[in-house]
Amino acid sequence: MRLISSLLLLVYSARLALSLNLTNQTAVLGYWGSNLAGKMGDRDQKRLSSYCQNTTYDAIILSSVIDFNVDGWPVYDFSNLCSDSDTFSGSELKKCPQIETDIQVCQENGIKVLLSIGGYNGNFSLNNDDDGTNFAFQVWNIFGSGEDSYRPFGKAVVDGFDLEVNKGTNTAYSAFAKRMLEIYASDPRRKYYISAAPTCMVPDHTLTKAISENSFDFLSIHTFNSSTGEGCSGSRNSTFDAWVEYAEDSAYNTNTSLFYGVVGHQNGSNGFISPKNLTRDLLNYKANSTLFGGVTIWDTSLAAMSYDNSSETFVEAIHKILDTKSKHSSSKSSHDSSQGLESTSSIALNPTSSISSTSSSSSTSSAISTISQDHTKTVTSVSDEPTTITASGATSVTTTTKTDFDTVTTTIVSTSTLISASDSTSIIVSSYVSTVTQPASTRVQTTTVSSISTSVKQPTASVASSSVSVPSSSSVQPQSSTPISSSSSASSPQSTLSTSSEVVSEVSSTLLSGSSAIPSTSSSTPSSSIISSPMTSVLSSSSSIPTSSSSDFSSSITTISSGISSSSIPSTFSSVSSILSSSTSSPSSTSLSISSSSTSSTFSSASTSSPSSISSSISSSSTILSSPTPSTSSLMISSSSIISGSSSILSSSISTIPISSSLSTYSSSVIPSSSTLVSSSSSLIVSSSPVASSSSSPIPSSSSLVSTYSASLSNITHSSLSLTAMSSSSAIPTSVNSSTLITASSSNTLLSSITSSSAIVSSTTVSNISSNLPSATASSQSQLTNSSTLATSLYLSSSSSRTISTSSTNEYNTSFHAPTVSSTTSSSSTTSLAANKGVNSNSITSLNLESTSSVTSTAYTTDSVTSTTALTSQGPSSSVVSSSLSSTTSLSTSIPVTSSVAPAVTSTGSETSSVVGSGTDSATSSSWTAETSSSAITSSVAASVTPTSSSSASSWSSSSEVDPSTAASATGSSTSSIATASVSGSSTSSVATASATDSSTSSIAAASVTGSSTSSVATASVTDSSTSSVATASATDSSTSSIAVASVTGSSTSSVATASATDSSTSSVATASITGSLSSSIATASVTGSPTSSVTAVSSTSSVEGTASSTIAAAASAATLSSDAASGSSTVTSSATASSSSSAATTADSSVTTDTPSNDFNANVDTAGLWYVSALSSYSVPAGFAWTTIDGFSVVMPSANAYKKRSLPIKATANPALNGAGTWKTIHTSATTTAA
């Protein structure tokens, strides 16, 4: 086995060595990707891997990248084998997954794959050195071994790049080659190639400078499509011979291999040369030029076609020519058709025994060419006992492979000698590999004779041991299912009344933590009530527990489907004639993470009550609807809408209560952390179902209803709430309390409605309060209490005016049928509004509104209404706005004995008061007036209503928080980077961030936020951009606060940083800064239309070698707006400070200090690119350097690469000699900077 492994390794090594040898004068290279045959109407080109299945080509060049820069990316075309529709997001860069796979197949078969830059149809042009260096870095990252997020060939890495260009400048392509070779040197793990395809003309106007200044591995000389007609046979300077002379005399690498470039079909291009006419030239160059490497064919699809009506393909004909021995060649074939190999080996083990082995192998073939490679391997071992063994042998292995094009015969001759004496053993193995490639049309016969040997075994004193450690791996897939069952039963004592009740409870849960399957069953059979709760639950290894259960018994049904850790439902019924129906439904979509090892359920019941039923279902993303409605002479409907994140809960319940019943109901729930439901009716109905969940979203809800009746009644209470807001999540705790006390027959109706929208207008209307009293003495009292808290945002316009309005309407209509009747109504409301949005914690605005009103109405007396309103607004620390508004409205009315109508009292929002009604009662001659008062307040008001005959209370609060953020970044691009992030129309807060980092040419980072009602933050930054940088941040139309920040850091040429905040009603901060820009910097910050406070900061710091710096800062801050609501005037007070500072070592010429040249001035300048100034203006400049002026100083620097900044830092080389003419000085920046 070891011998076979060694032989296979030798075969692979030989093949690899062949694939790396591009200078053996028989190599054939092919261009693939242009599909020239398909464009001529013939068969389309095959996929790349089909050309790598045999030894037809030693290397394949992908053709090609046809454009340098379209929207910042190179453009490439591989015809039918890379789809235009499959591109990387946000670019025109195409994905080529099939080519990725094929490149790896070719490389595994020992065939190198290069990428052509330009191509026959390329619109390619590099016009300056920057284009060349930057493009080299870009194609290395995209196609080579670099790191780029967009890689058309995925993980495949090409083996090099080929320049096939005819546009642009000589210096640009020289810069490209120079940078590429430097990058190659950074990855010594593998060999990368650089090649070019110049025209016949010497010099080539785009490539000769690159060839003379850089070491190219090989050149493919175009012998077609030239101005001289067929091939390179024109003038003296347009022949292949001219390129041989140029390579030997002028190329940087005088050993650069030259390939004869031909087109593969007569219809492919001008200058086609048939194989018959190529034979003489190719054999001549092969015999007489050591630089001749072989033939390059345009392209592989043409080369696979027959030519000039020949039966063979063009590439087959080329191989036949290159494999022919030239009569001028002094080399000899290492194998011919009649030669056989024979070897005899003998091993002497001791004086009396021997082993002899004879093996021979003969092979007959039409050998056209032989490539041989010698391998010698020596292995030395040590044995414990002295042993002398001498053995020798030869083995010949012949392998023949037949393909569509060629027959390949490989013969491996292995000779081994074993010499062992005393304590050392030597094994010498010599292998000879002979490979013959022959066209398919030649018949090859191969005969192999295996060796026959006899042996006598003799034990020796040699001890050999081997140990092989094979690691093992195992995969265990655990599966477990552990059921845990629990059961409970409930019993009931004797019931006084025969009742029926139905309890339905459904809880659906999915547990994401694996524990166990939990079935639970309980049953109870009281006299007339049965409660049963079977619980089933399944737990699989994937930690999902679906549960379901159902039970149906005589009078009561309880169904529970739950994955909860504990559940208890005790209930007791007493003798009442009431039915409570409560239903709660919610859509399921709940994931609960519960860590519990056991489940317990307890149900107990003692029922002496009339029928009662409860059904409930609770889940995390749920809707709970609850509305209790007493039906016998009393009806109450309550609805509330609750929005919290992705959770919506609506609850409703309906109750029907007879006259003589007493019902007390209390319900509270907290979802999703825990949920508890408690109900009671005279005797107690208590239900508890806690649910544990991994999410945290508390939504408390409680309600209670207490009613007492001693006579028949008709009572209707309606409360509705409508909220329209721009928030995406809200949490609304809700409570309702209602009590009714009636001592006589009466009918009362109270209507309370609250509407809230983004304009936040609230109204409260109380109407139609009437009493029909059969007796002479009666009284009615009604109390209205409103209390609400709303967390929202205020709209404060840019002109410093507040558009805050509120309106309320109270209507009182009372009819009396007895002479002694009194009616009293009082109302009070408190509203607080707070906004706290954005990243600025100081951006807090609160609004407190208090209103108190009372109405007293008595027969023959005066009614009065009093209303007081107070407004307080608290803004950021730099701005405090306080306003208090109050109004009092009084109403006096003379009421007849039988009826009284009080005119409407309206509060509407104009900050003025006027009499809107007046009159005189005819019976009493008393006069009455009504006033209208208003205040500039916009608020959200929630109402609590308590009528005379029944009382109820409801309150709600809403809080919302939205934080949409958008971020974009671009990192490490050698050419240009553009990062843009924007947010539009966000009602609460917006954050847009854009950054560009380490871009060598240009960077643009822009961030913008538009139309955000609460707060906006826009940030744009550019870091280490070598040529130009633009950072722009803007925040527009933000009603509360805006922050715009733009910064540029470390830009060597020019920088622009702009930040602006526009029309922000509360506070704005705009900051622009530039740091370390060598040439020019512009920093601009502006704030427009901010009525409260504005801060504009502009800072610029520039330093070179730390000897001079300047800082300019300007700010407008501490702006305060105070307004007088009564007079409608406002005052803005602001203060501004500006400061500047600068420092410098010295001024004018004294800013040059005497020290030796150093290489720490700028680590990113080009090679030998340090900047120095000479003390003597008449100093003679060394070769390769030139005078220039920087910051007013005369400077000597390398002339070729002056003022160049590289993407990758390169340490400067040694400083030029002064030749005794003067002393070098290190440059510093100018001395004085004046603050603007």
UniProtKB/Swiss-Prot annotation:
The keyword S-adenosyl-L-methionine does not apply. InterPro entries: Cts1-like, Glyco_hydro18_cat, Glycoside_hydrolase_SF, Glycosyl_Hydrlase18_Chitinase. Residues 352-367, 822-832, 1125-1156 have a biased composition (Low complexity). GO terms for molecular function: chitinase activity. PROSITE patterns: GH18_2. One of its GO terms (cellular component) is fungal-type cell wall. Coiled coil: none annotated. The keyword Transcription does not apply. Residues 339-351, 810-821 have a biased composition (Polar residues). Keywords: Glycoprotein, Glycosidase, Hydrolase, Secreted, Signal. Residues 1-19 form the signal peptide. Glycans are attached at residues 21, 24, 54, 123, 225, 237, 255, 267, 277, 288, 309, 715, 737, 768, 786, 813. This is Chitinase-like protein PB1E7.04c. It comes from Schizosaccharomyces pombe (strain 972 / ATCC 24843).
